[in-house]
Amino acid sequence: MKRMIALDGAQGEGGGQILRSALSLSMITGQPFTITSIRAGRAKPGLLRQHLTAVKAAAEICRATVEGAELGSQRLVFRPGTVRGGEYRFAIGSAGSCTLVLQTVLPALWFADGPSRVEVSGGTDNPSAPPADFIRRVLEPLLAKIGIHQQTTLLRHGFYPAGGGVVATEVSPVASFNTLQLGERGNIVQMRGEVLLAGVSRHVAEREIATLAGSFSLHEQNIHNLPRDQGPGNTVSLEVESENITERFFVVGEKRVSAEVVAAQLVKEVKRYLASPAAVGEYLADQLVLPMALAGAGEFKVAHPSCHLLTNIAVVERFLPVRFGLIETDGVTRVSIE
């Protein structure tokens, strides 16, 4: 019988990342875990709908037994069974992030007995979660280099607070893992600006694009009007294609915040990324830790190691026989498997 791993949910960033990573790793390794003080660092601690959906989705995919799977719960016991491929559908029932639920269960399906398709309904454009286009255009090409083949499709947008969006991913079992090496970004090839609108004036998008164009040389400027029933909502994205990597950054528009201020937030974030030669942005770094650990080797460079990244590494090291090394030189941190 495998040992029970005890986790403190208040560790590190004190949010949902510890829970999501633990669920993924428990499903993969077969190790049960107990987590207390779930989301202790948040204004509303405990399981929200998005986290509860992730728990229930994980339990269904690996036939786990679970204690504490209810809204507001700050303690959870998860005993995994065998991961099985297949077709799955999960509904968050709010504007909670579809991609964070997918992020939780997809790694386990890399080890399933056959191909799978997972569809999640909920929020798609959430300020605290990666959008589907980030997964599709940035993360999945890198996963393919590691030997992980999955394809994400955004079927319907769902902005906060209404939700109603749908994201689906098709994934195949991994035959073998490759080593990922991501050092410097290299020269910029092109930059693309994009604005999504649903039930919002096109004039807002034009002002947002103008703000981006005032700071960067954009090779593409795209405005997409979505059906009104998918909003109201607005997101602004900027994609940076470089010689060695494509990165994507975004902000979600807010009520009573001007288009210029919204776009300026994005400009600031992209400039922060471009100020360093490191290939990997702050948010992408979080996503690379688990697949790199499963490969057992690899490295990347990031300018600003986030609390999410450090938390993720700490959880991975509890479940897998790997150790990460972080070495900072001239403002760039090299993250590698030791």
UniProtKB/Swiss-Prot annotation:
It is found in: Cytoplasm. One of its GO terms (biological process) is RNA processing. Keywords: ATP-binding, Cytoplasm, Ligase, Nucleotide-binding. It catalyses: a 3'-end 3'-phospho-ribonucleotide-RNA + ATP = a 3'-end 2',3'-cyclophospho-ribonucleotide-RNA + AMP + diphosphate. GO terms for molecular function: ATP binding; RNA-3'-phosphate cyclase activity. The active site is at H308. Gene3D superfamilies: RNA 3'-terminal phosphate cyclase domain, RNA 3'-terminal phosphate cyclase, insert domain. It comes from the Bacteria. It is an enzyme of class 6 (ligase). Its EC number is 6.5.1.4. GO terms for cellular component: cytoplasm. SUPFAM superfamilies: EPT/RTPC-like (SSF55205), RNA 3'-terminal phosphate cyclase, RPTC, insert domain (SSF52913). Transmembrane segments: none annotated. ATP binds at Q103, Y283, L284, A285, D286, Q287. Belongs to the RNA 3'-terminal cyclase family. Type 1 subfamily. Catalyzes the conversion of 3'-phosphate to a 2',3'-cyclic phosphodiester at the end of RNA. The mechanism of action of the enzyme occurs in 3 steps: (A) adenylation of the enzyme by ATP; (B) transfer of adenylate to an RNA-N3'P to produce RNA-N3'PP5'A; (C) and attack of the adjacent 2'-hydroxyl on the 3'-phosphorus in the diester linkage to produce the cyclic end product. The biological role of this enzyme is unknown but it is likely to function in some aspects of cellular RNA processing. PANTHER family: RNA 3' TERMINAL PHOSPHATE CYCLASE, RNA 3'-TERMINAL PHOSPHATE CYCLASE. This is RNA 3'-terminal phosphate cyclase. The lineage of its organism: Bacteria, Pseudomonadati, Pseudomonadota, Gammaproteobacteria, Enterobacterales.
